[in-house]
Structures are given as C-alpha cells and as structure tokens.
C-alpha cells in the first residue's frame, strides 16, 4: 500500500519489487477495469516458454485485423514507429495485458520511472528483449471510468511516439 496514488508506473514497480523479493519467475500486468480475462494467462506463459520470450503481449490483433477507427489511428502509429525503430511488428502495442519474465521484472525495478508502456517495451526490444504476442479477446470495461478523453488520448499517443523516436534511445 502506498500513502498516495503513485499511478501505473509506481504500482507496477511495487508489484515487480515484491515479485523479485519473493522469487517469482514472471509478472503479468492486467488493467484494473475488468477487460482482461484470466483464461489467457496460461497461453501467455506457454508462449513465453515456447518462444523463449522476455515479454508476451495479450493482443487483440494477432489473428484479427484492427478496426478502422479514430481510436486505432494512434495504435497504428505506435505500431509503425516500433517497426521502424525496432524492426519488429507489435500488433497491439497499447494492450495493458503483458507478461514479463524475471529478467524484465528486474529491469523495471532497476530503472526509475520506467513503466509498462509501449515506449518501455520498445526500449527493451532495442536492448535485445524478445517479444511475442498471443491472440486474446477483451471485454468491454467492467468497472471504473477511463481517465482518457480525446485530448488525453492524443497527448498520450504523442508522448509515446516522441519517447520511442527520441527519448528511449538514451
């Protein structure tokens, strides 16, 4: 428990630190709104073992084409920038369902302000991390309200793209 809300990065790093201290092999990230379904955890673990992956993303778009919508423009842009900078396609870079192996968990604990976001995944890929994806289905939001509105979504996508292109190289 934190005395104040430390946000996604602070909460994720606390969970990673706990996992390291208690000898866990991996950490899975779920959004707190109920979209992610637990039946996909084992297929993600199996993919990590089969592929020797460091990160496995629960993707909506491995076998299903991304819909054409304003919401998906940012996702397509991030996918393109990751392909340009890392040489690999991530079909669903903004998915909040990700599995990280022990080595990646240690990276998140070691680096200040290094959260489980597409720019951090791209940085780790450039450092040699292997990323795989597993097709998943996601439910509509089951609880809470999104903090994102149109302006915040545009701002998030712009910051993420700038970070992948410029900041994460250092």
Question: Where are the regions that the model predicts?
Answer:
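Structural signal for conserved beta-strand scaffold positions within catalytic alpha/beta enzyme cores
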Residues: 1, 57, 133-135
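Acceptor/aglycone-binding surface of glycosyltransferases and processive sugar-polymer synthases
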Residues: 3-4, 8-21, 26, 38-114, ...
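Cys/His-dense Zn2+-coordinating finger/ribbon modules
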Residues: 32
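Glycine/small-residue-rich loop that forms an oxyanion/phosphate-binding "nest" at active or ligand-binding sites
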Residues: 35
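Catalytic donor-sugar/metal-binding loop of nucleotide-sugar-dependent glycosyltransferases
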Residues: 89, 111-112, 122-139
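Cell-envelope/extracellular polymer assembly enzymes that use nucleotide-activated donors
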Residues: 119
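Active-site-adjacent helix/loop segment of glycosyltransferases
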Residues: 170
